[in-house]
């Protein structure tokens, strides 16, 4: 090979190496940990919700199973602010002022709980860091767990896991879309399967 061709070949190799070093790495599928969603769980913790204009915070307890959901939201002083109970036949919201609202499903009542709509069926996946079908995992942490998921216009950030085990459930989750934002600090997890 002539010196000029060797030089061009070497230059092409160096340029290729430099360009690949500048490329944004994408999470490798084989690095991702397969996470299965639990059909039954209980979580307890602290939460805050804001629609950009108004916000509220308090405690939350959520019992989820195949028959439905029971979500109780407590005020910062520990009083029940709202209780949402859903089943395949419908949903009911009871508020601290004695109001009772009914709808076909829990999602229809979420604006009364948080001030904006939230897809409850997908939220059950999100809190477990088990993205539902169609969700895009944009970032993984060092253990191969979701760090950022985009799903139906919602951004789900996993801010903390309690340890480095691959299948550990998250303890800090932030869900947002536009000005709507829910922050969860989960103090208690129970998988009930």
Swiss-Prot record:
One of its GO terms (biological process) is protein transport. Keywords: Cell outer membrane, Chaperone, Lipoprotein, Membrane, Palmitate, Protein transport, Signal, Transport. InterPro entries: LolA/LolB/LppX (IPR029046), OM_lipoprot_LolB (IPR004565). A lipid is attached at residue 22 (N-palmitoyl cysteine). The keyword Lipoprotein applies. This is Outer-membrane lipoprotein LolB. It comes from Azoarcus sp. (strain BH72). CDD domains: LolB. GO terms for cellular component: cell outer membrane. A lipid is attached at residue 22 (S-diacylglycerol cysteine). Residues 1-21 form the signal peptide.
